[in-house]
């Protein structure tokens, strides 16, 4: 997917977070120009690659998104922004729906209005709930058991619906807990 777009502009949300910052570094190393949107609520600006452009604001800010999208042509958007703590999602389910679904939807509606319709979305394997086997396959039963997973699945369903309308192309990443150190 990325080889088809080499030397292009990429818009990346959540690039000051653990996964997003690692992806940003890899994209820059591969020759991409990366613009990062991050509100820095949970991210750390020190993780952002020096060669990336960092825009600090919330992804639901249509005016600022429009300004960025009108400044250059982006080949794709990689969406890593969002809230990620399962325990917190149980205490504040509406907050997780707001950040992981509602704000993401506003962001992508704005992107699509500018013709930016290639999307890679960072979801979670938590959408499978408690699987019956250690080998989880993409086509296994979806059964989220916490508000975090439900908010991610809700946005996945939004992407699927928009693809059926012919408005976008997407890749959804459903990985398990990511851990590591820099």
Place the predicted regions along the sequence by residue.
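N-terminal Rossmann-like NAD(P)+-binding domain of SDR-like oxidoreductases, especially those catalyzing
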Residues: 1-181
């Amino acid at each position: 997917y990325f080889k088809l777009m080499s030397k292009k502009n990429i818009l990346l949300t959540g690039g000051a977070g653990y996964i997003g910052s690692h992806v940003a570094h890899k994209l820059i190393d591969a020759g991409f120009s990366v613009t990062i949107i991050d509100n820095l609520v949970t991210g750390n600006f020190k993780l952002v690659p020096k060669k990336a452009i960092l825009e600090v604001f919330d992804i639901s800010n249509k005016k600022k998104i429009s300004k960025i999208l009108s400044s250059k042509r982006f080949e794709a958007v990689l969406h890593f922004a969002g809230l990620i703590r399962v325990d917190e999602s149980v205490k504040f389910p509406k907050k997780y729906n707001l950040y992981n679904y509602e704000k993401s939807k506003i962001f992508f509606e704005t992107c699509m209005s500018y013709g930016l319709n290639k999307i890679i979305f960072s979801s979670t394997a938590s959408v499978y709930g408690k699987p019956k086997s250690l080998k989880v396959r993409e086509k296994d039963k979806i059964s989220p058991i916490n508000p975090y997973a439900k908010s991610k699945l809700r946005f996945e369903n939004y992407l699927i619906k928009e693809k059926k309308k012919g408005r976008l192309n997407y890749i959804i990443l459903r990985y398990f807990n990511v851990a590591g150190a820099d």
